[in-house]
């Protein structure tokens, strides 16, 4: 393997194969909470101007504001309201957002960097576990599962989203 041996070793040690989960709860969440417009409610002229949203290769609807959509999606994933192994990618040239929930994808963790160009983990004052790194360090229900959708109230009780964002995940999984 020559010069790529370090890269191969890193990928072998840090990579993770996703287990996957059903796309149906995510599609329901996208239509109800993310304002993804269903195709049957849109006219052809509207579809031409909007961004297409695909989940596991299926066109499930369209949106108007892809920046707000992807930022909100990632924030909800960082506070575990969307499973951590869900990937999102915005293809600007084709005006398509791809979301994947299927199993068998090779992914690897990356650190989030805050606005001061420091890793987000420097904001933590306590010891971190792997679950804290990928799901945030907010207190969750006892039988928390990273591949299940939870409502904010069921997972965290009455806490406000702004409070949850302070202790959000500092690692993200990206597809390799």
Task: Describe every region a protein language model picked out.
Residues 1-176:
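Conduit-forming functional cores of very large proteins
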């Amino acid at each position: 393997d020559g010069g790529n041996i370090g890269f191969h070793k890193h990928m072998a040690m840090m990579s993770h194969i996703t287990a996957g989960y059903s796309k149906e709860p995510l599609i329901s969440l996208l239509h109800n909470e993310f304002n993804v417009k269903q195709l049957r409610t849109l006219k052809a002229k509207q579809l031409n101007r909007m961004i297409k949203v695909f989940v596991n290769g299926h066109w499930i609807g369209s949106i108007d504001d892809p920046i707000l959509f992807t930022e909100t999606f990632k924030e909800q994933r960082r506070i575990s309201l969307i499973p951590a192994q869900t990937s999102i990618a915005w293809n600007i040239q084709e005006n398509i957002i791809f979301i994947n929930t299927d199993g068998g994808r090779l992914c690897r963790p990356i650190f989030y960097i805050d606005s001061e160009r420091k890793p987000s983990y420097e904001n933590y004052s306590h010891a971190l576990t792997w679950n804290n790194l990928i799901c945030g360090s907010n207190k969750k229900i006892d039988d928390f599962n990273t591949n299940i959708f939870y409502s904010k109230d069921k997972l965290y009780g009455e806490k406000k989203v702004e409070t949850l964002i302070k202790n959000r995940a500092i690692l993200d999984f990206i597809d390799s």
